[in-house]
Amino acid sequence: MASFANPFAGNVPRKITKEELIQAIRLDIAGELEAIFVYDAHVQATDDPVAKTVLADIRDEEKAHVGELMTLLQYLDPDEAERFAEGQQEVKEMLEKLNISTKGTTKPNTTVGSLVKE
């Protein structure tokens, strides 16, 4: 949550390690996903067309942030990137077993952020 009362809340006594940065990026991703959920709930809860439009736009920007952070995480932790790719492949194989075509639905190595309409 916001800590505006403390002007030094963002100051840190040292640079973080790569491992700490990876953990921080994961936490950032969780925060972005939570923001997407909240903004989407607001969109669904109002009939005001201006509010719906603005909130949906903000929600979609958060989706792009997830994509940016996922890309950064994959850069910082190539092993984790391989596991993400393995998971994507497993789902593709399941879809094939169910005779569901994925051709033309997504680009290879897509992320949540890359699925946002441009």
Language model feature labels by segment:
Residues M1-E118:
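Iron-associated oxidoreductase/ferritin-like identity signal
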